Amino acid sequence: MSGEDSIRSFPVPDLGEGLQEVTVTCWSVAVGDDVEINQTLCSVETAKAEVEIPSPYAGRIVELGGAEGDVLKVGAELVRIDTGPTAVAQPNGEGAVPTLVGYGADTAIETSRRTSRPLAAPVVRKLAKELAVDLAALQRGSGAGGVITRADVLAAARGGVGAGPDVRPVHGVHARMAEKMTLSHKEIPTAKASVEVICAELLRLRDRFVSAAPEITPFALTLRLLVIALKHNVILNSTWVDSGEGPQVHVHRGVHLGFGAATERGLLVPVVTDAQDKNTRELASRVAELITGAREGTLTPAELRGSTFTVSNFGALGVDDGVPVINHPEAAILGLGAIKPRPVVVGGEVVARPTMTLTCVFDHRVVDGAQVAQFMCELRDLIESPETALLDL
């Protein structure tokens, strides 16, 4: 095989879910490195998740298709690899066989030799890029074996701060969130309604099950009651559509419940599909799984799309009240404030009770004030007397 014939081009793979571009967050190889089949070439960030892309060939890296931070289209050249018999020496002295095993193969590999690139984990390289720290200038880090650590990068950034701004590129999850929020603000005429809810019975119910079913949290119980209220007030679980036949409201048969989850990568919205078909334990377990997956970065794109109604639980961050932005193109979003003891009037006396503020922001083209009032009052009543509604526990 001639030199040119042995060079294989590997394009950015189609990662599914309609994604059209990726951002290269970290290269694990450099030009001149030897790679083996299924060895990680780089990490890329999409609008949904961060994934590692493995090599389908064994050989030597000839060219990289972009630098860290570059945005590459699906199908664009990611790397060029020389798979010729002289490119990589095998343990038995024979030439390597250029074998394409397909994206995501499970073949075990050994790490190939590296060039003299600074030693740092992908997340540290990403931080260094955001802070404009040259890893090569650090030479050797304080970690084991000279690995450059997060502390090394932060120390270098503090020492080299100039008069200019800290420029941080927006891509991946952050870019997708910004796009949806901007679209929501531009296209949806919103209004809001709030109610204060006494949560004493909700917390008592949670306490009864905390030992046997710790996943049944006040948040999970509230979501289950929300699903009940949405099934009785279906207009909140809908979407405004400008079709060729004129404006339409699409009322969704299934409640696909999204909820905001703050992660190191930004705000994610995991989705509980067909929440109306789950009992309280099933819903609570699924919510716990999705929260864990969001924090660990293991959610699939399918678990982050398709919501018909979204909940913003800013109360989990200690915030009493707020006005969330509708997750376009949904018709409404519900904000949950923190549950705290607050003064309320009971039987003519002021007493302390655990309360929570619920705020519904809604698309006023789809829903009118009376419909939202009915929905919010029903949800308040369910939360204040939850036991009968949750007989499926």
UniProtKB/Swiss-Prot annotation:
The modification N6-lipoyllysine is found at residue 48. Residues 119-157 form the Peripheral subunit-binding (PSBD) domain. Residues 7-82 form the Lipoyl-binding domain. One of its GO terms (cellular component) is plasma membrane. CDD domains: lipoyl_domain. Coiled coil: none annotated. The active site is at 364, 368. Its cofactor is (R)-lipoate. Its EC number is 2.3.1.168. It catalyses: N(6)-[(R)-dihydrolipoyl]-L-lysyl-[protein] + 2-methylpropanoyl-CoA = N(6)-[(R)-S(8)-2-methylpropanoyldihydrolipoyl]-L-lysyl-[protein] + CoA. Transmembrane segments: none annotated. Binds 1 lipoyl cofactor covalently. One of its GO terms (molecular function) is dihydrolipoyllysine-residue (2-methylpropanoyl)transferase activity. InterPro entries: 2-oxoacid_DH_actylTfrase (IPR001078), 2-oxoacid_DH_E2_comp (IPR050743), Biotin_lipoyl (IPR000089), CAT-like_dom_sf (IPR023213), E3-bd_dom_sf (IPR036625), PSBD (IPR004167), Single_hybrid_motif (IPR011053). Keywords: Acyltransferase, Lipoyl, Transferase. Induction: Up-regulated upon nutrient starvation. Is also highly up-regulated in a DlaT-deficient strain. Part of the bkdABC operon. PROSITE patterns: BIOTINYL_LIPOYL, PSBD. Forms a 24-polypeptide structural core with octahedral symmetry. Part of the BCKADH complex, consisting of multiple copies of BkdA/BkdB (E1), BkdC (E2) and Lpd (E3). Component of the branched-chain alpha-ketoacid dehydrogenase (BCKADH) complex, that catalyzes the overall conversion of branched-chain alpha-ketoacids to acyl-CoA and CO(2). Belongs to the 2-oxoacid dehydrogenase family. This is Dihydrolipoyllysine-residue acyltransferase component of branched-chain alpha-ketoacid dehydrogenase complex. It comes from Mycobacterium tuberculosis (strain ATCC 25618 / H37Rv). The gene is bkdC.
